[in-house]
Regions:
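Active-site-proximal beta-strand/loop segments in catalytic clefts of secreted hydrolases
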Residues: 1, 17-21, 51-55, 113-117, ...
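Flexible loop/turn segments at secondary-structure boundaries
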Residues: 1-2, 22-26, 56-61, 119-121, ...
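Acidic, glycine-rich loop-and-beta core segments that form the ion-binding/anion-interacting portion
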Residues: 1-9
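Aromatic/acidic polysaccharide-binding cleft in carbohydrate-active enzymes
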Residues: 11-79, 88-96
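Hydrophobic, well-ordered secondary-structure elements that form the walls
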Residues: 40, 74, 111, 137, ...
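Carbohydrate-binding surface patches
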Residues: 93-133, 166
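Solvent-exposed beta-hairpin/edge-strand motifs
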Residues: 127-146
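C-terminal beta-strand-rich structural cap/linker in extracellular carbohydrate-active enzymes
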Residues: 150-169
């Protein structure tokens, strides 16, 4: 990307701000936001994704504070990828319609997996240069909003996890 060619050598940071995406409470119209954040962070090598419309019809909340589904999608990244974390190498598209990014910081590893397929996907993850015994999981899907999920046990630096259809884990 142009950023890597021009700005990165100068020590500049790239922040991507949101733009209008036709999205409502329907998970299938929300999934492009998750894919966009993945692309911005992985392909674009951005340092941040900023969503600045909070209470607004296209924002994260209604005027009464009710969270829209898009807030939970963004939250899948924002809650777990904290200041000071860095993106680390991951197979960005390990399966058709599955997008993965990984981050490390504060002695933790965060993997964000987006399954935009209409079917569940059993995905194997292999960790390198990290020792992890288990992961806590959180999912946003058609029926869940950043809901705590099952623990993922790691054996020999590898684990397999089922990613529900149209979900962010």
């Amino acid at each position: 990307p142009l950023f890597q060619q021009k700005a990165a050598p100068l020590g500049k940071k790239l922040w991507q701000t949101e733009h209008y995406v036709n999205s409502d409470a329907n998970i299938s119209t929300i999934m492009p936001i998750a894919k966009e954040i993945h692309d911005v962070m992985v392909t674009g090598s951005a340092n941040a994704y900023v969503y600045w419309w909070i209470p607004h019809a296209n924002g994260l909340t209604a005027n009464d504070g009710t969270l829209f589904k898009r807030a939970y999608v963004i939250g899948q990244f924002a809650k777990h990828v904290r200041p000071g974390y860095f993106r680390v190498e991951a197979t960005a598209t390990p399966a058709t319609n599955v997008y993965v990014s990984a981050y490390a910081g504060n002695g933790k590893v965060v993997i964000v997996a987006v399954n935009s397929s209409t079917a569940a996907v059993s995905q194997t993850f292999t960790l390198q240069n990290a020792t992890v015994s288990q992961f806590s999981t959180w999912q946003t899907s058609a029926s869940a909003n950043m809901a705590a999920g099952s623990e993922a046990s790691v054996s020999g630096n590898s684990f397999t996890f089922s990613l529900p259809a149209q979900s962010i884990t």
